């Protein structure tokens, strides 16, 4: 048995089927995994649903608890005891996994001999999930130096022997954050922890109603669990210096991503604040003060208040931090926040620096193809600075080549009161061979020596072009296409520059006007103003100005008048190969439809007969296609 899946179930009749369906429909063969469902004395039809799946699928196991435990810990422990799999995966009854998750998880873990493997999480219906640790796949991450402490949920693949040999179970004496205690204990005993970030393994779903993560928990239970984690770190085999750093990492997580975040604001009464502060203080005093030097500055300031038993100061500070723009200024290239709550303490300037908390808030209002450029319009401000200070920023557009990391800079065409317009000239972006490839767009903002750069595009108005829309241009070396698009994972603006050899076109013709149209289907192509069709007749090259360009999301139509072409070819007495190109002979047009025949003109001409009598003969000028080529026939 490769994997045992553990699901604690309590009153999940509306949710459990979606979860189980994702588990029984895996690409991994069913004989390789088991699904252990532990019903915690449900009062709805959950148990009946579980038994239906058990009857239908041989790899579904159902355990019925006789007494409700009040939490998922005890049911999970029951399942661990009977699990037959080499690995154990914990799944909540209101979540589900990707169809390839088990096979990928197992193969990756076996290949890397992992004790624990974190599979990439995905939030559904607005459910927030940890992301920082899933930026790249890493078969061997460091517990202290990585971001994995920021995900302490049990939705991971654990080696069964790791849990059983080290007697790692979910604590049942606490009813809050028991999964964090379990996961930290497993982290501390694991010899190798891996991260697989190339597939959405586990889907956490935000449901209507109250989720355990946001339900009220008494402070003594919550901070009791936090003290258990600190105790586990202290008792671990880590070197003392690494223990201190790990506790600091945990404190960063705790204050920014737990119930303690802005705790004095969440508590509505003085009595609640005092009670929570008492247990918070007890927890913090269990952490050695040496850890304080390794936490983030805003966490260090909180610890200052807590270690000085200053609830009033912490309350004032957390409110001031919510309104940080009032207190933040730019000083010698640094963002400094001078909070009144800190005036009674002797604080170094270094602790007041908040550069790391700032980010550029941006919104793309419009992206527009315009002649030979792409117009990029939007707004951008510094999150921590007020409107008046933001008015002083200067902007630079930066294109960074994804492979070579080369950079190209453009000044804004206009900038006023945080609203910008950049004109990206395609010919400047694609001027040499080394420019081929993907260019990622950034905006860099600077104020009084302080600089910050951000990727742009993931917050925007609707993009009005199709994913195939491109600009077709040329330089002295080659013809190129420039296609703006938004990246897959982060949804930011990039431009893909590629060499372009030819474009397939269908033909249509208006006999009366002598208008010939080239129809490029499944493409929206933008061209420079005053574009032309180049015609190579074999003896000469003729330029036909583009009379009209009709653009639709999935079609481009170029129309030219061919009267001058007909005049030049009037002397042709036999079929001749001709070539069409756009703006340069390198940018060829090929015939998309084979054996197409278009009559360009019909004339009556005088011919001598064998009896030396003149005779009027009707002749046709035709444009033919064959094997992607064009032919002129008289």
Swiss-Prot record:
Disulfide bonds: none
Catalytic activity: 4-O-[(D-ribitylphospho)(n)-D-ribitylphospho-(2R)-glycerylphospho]-N-acetyl-beta-D-mannosaminyl-(1->4)-N-acetyl-alpha-D-glucosaminyl di-trans,octa-cis-undecaprenyl diphosphate + n UDP-alpha-D-glucose = 4-O-[(2-beta-D-glucosyl-D-ribitylphospho)(n)-D-ribitylphospho-(2R)-glycerylphospho]-N-acetyl-beta-D-mannosaminyl-(1->4)-N-acetyl-alpha-D-glucosaminyl di-trans,octa-cis-undecaprenyl diphosphate + n UDP + n H(+)
Top class in the EC scheme: transferase
Enzyme Commission code(s) on record: 2.4.1.53
GO molecular-function terms, A-Z: poly(ribitol-phosphate) beta-glucosyltransferase activity
Null allele phenotype: Deletion of the gene abolishes all WTA glucose modifications.
Classification via InterPro entries: Glyco_trans_2-like, Nucleotide-diphossugar_trans, TarS/TarP_linker, TarS_C1
Listed Pfam families: Glycos_transf_2, TarS_C1, TarS_linker
UniProt cross-references to Gene3D superfamilies, sorted A to Z: Spore Coat Polysaccharide Biosynthesis Protein SpsA, Chain A
Entry annotated with the keyword Cell wall biogenesis/degradation: yes
Record bears the keyword Cell wall biogenesis/degradation: yes
GO biological process, one term: teichoic acid biosynthetic process
Record key words, sorted: Cell wall biogenesis/degradation, Glycosyltransferase, Teichoic acid biosynthesis, Transferase
Pathway(s) the chain acts in: Cell wall biogenesis; poly(ribitol phosphate) teichoic acid biosynthesis
Top-level taxon of origin: Bacteria
Protein function: Attaches glucose residues to poly(RboP)-wall teichoic acids (WTAs).
Family: Belongs to the glycosyltransferase 2 family.
The protein's name: Poly(ribitol-phosphate) beta-glucosyltransferase
Gene: tarQ
């Amino acid at each position: 048995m490769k994997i045992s899946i553990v699901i604690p179930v309590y009153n999940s009749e509306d949710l459990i089927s979606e979860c189980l369906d994702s588990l029984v429909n895996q690409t991994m063969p069913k004989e390789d995994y088991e699904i252990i469902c532990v019903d915690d004395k449900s009062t709805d039809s959950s148990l009946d649903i579980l038994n239906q799946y058990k009857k239908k699928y041989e790899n579904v196991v159902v355990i019925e608890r006789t007494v409700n435990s009040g939490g998922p810990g005890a049911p999970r422990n029951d399942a661990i005891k009977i699990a037959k799999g080499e690995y154990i995966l914990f799944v909540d009854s209101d979540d589900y996994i990707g169809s390839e998750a088990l096979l990928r998880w197992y193969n990756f873990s076996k290949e890397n001999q992992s004790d624990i493997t974190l599979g990439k999480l995905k939030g559904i219906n607005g459910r927030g999930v940890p992301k920082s640790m899933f930026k790249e796949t890493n078969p061997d991450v460091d517990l202290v130096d990585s971001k994995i402490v920021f995900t302490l949920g049990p939705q991971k693949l654990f080696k069964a022997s790791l849990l059983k040999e080290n007697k790692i179970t979910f604590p049942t004496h606490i009813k809050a954050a028991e999964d964090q205690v379990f996961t930290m204990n497993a982290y501390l005993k694991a010899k190798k922890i891996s991260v697989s970030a190339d597939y959405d393994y586990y889907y956490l779903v935000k449901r209507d109603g109250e989720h355990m993560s946001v339900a009220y928990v008494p402070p003594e239970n919550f901070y009791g669990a936090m003290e258990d984690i600190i105790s586990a770190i202290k008792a671990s085999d880590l070197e003392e210096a690494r223990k201190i750093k790990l506790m600091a990492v945990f404190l960063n997580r705790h204050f920014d991503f737990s119930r303690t975040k802005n705790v004095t604001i969440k508590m509505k009464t003085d009595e609640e604040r005092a009670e929570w502060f008492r247990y918070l203080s007890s927890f913090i005093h269990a952490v050695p003060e040496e850890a304080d030097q390794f936490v983030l500055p805003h966490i260090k300031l909180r610890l200052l208040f807590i270690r000085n038993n200053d609830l009033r100061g912490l309350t004032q500070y957390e409110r001031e931090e919510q309104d940080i723009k009032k207190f933040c200024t730019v000083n010698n290239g640094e963002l400094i926040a001078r909070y009144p709550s800190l005036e009674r303490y002797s604080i170094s300037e270094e602790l007041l620096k908040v550069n790391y908390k700032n980010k550029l808030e941006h919104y793309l209002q419009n992206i527009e193809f315009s002649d030979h450029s792409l117009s990029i319009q939007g707004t951008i401000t510094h999150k921590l600075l007020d409107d008046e200070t933001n008015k002083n920023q200067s902007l630079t557009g930066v294109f960074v080549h994804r492979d070579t990391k080369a950079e190209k800079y453009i000044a804004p065409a206009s900038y006023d009161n945080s609203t910008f317009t950049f004109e990206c000239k395609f010919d400047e972006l694609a001027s040499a061979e080394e420019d081929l490839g993907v260019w990622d767009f950034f905006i860099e903002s600077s104020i009084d020596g302080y600089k910050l750069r951000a990727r742009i595009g993931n917050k925007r108005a609707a993009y009005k072009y199709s994913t195939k829309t491109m600009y077709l241009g040329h330089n002295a070396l080659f013809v190129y296409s420039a296609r703006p698009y938004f990246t897959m994972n982060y949804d930011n603006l990039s431009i893909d520059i590629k060499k372009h050899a030819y474009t397939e076109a269908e033909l249509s013709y208006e006999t009366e006007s002598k208008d010939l149209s080239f129809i490029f289907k499944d493409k929206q192509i933008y061209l420079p103003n005053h574009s032309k069709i180049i015609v190579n007749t074999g003896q000469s090259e003729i330029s036909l100005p583009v009379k009209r360009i009709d653009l639709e999301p999935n079609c481009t139509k170029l129309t030219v008048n061919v009267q001058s072409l007909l005049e030049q070819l009037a002397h042709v007495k036999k079929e001749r190969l001709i070539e069409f190109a756009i703006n340069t002979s390198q940018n060829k047009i090929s015939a998309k439809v084979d054996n197409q025949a278009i009559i360009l003109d019909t004339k009556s001409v005088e011919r001598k007969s064998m009896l030396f009598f003149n005779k009027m003969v009707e002749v046709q000028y035709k444009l033919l296609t064959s094997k992607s080529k064009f032919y002129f026939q008289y």
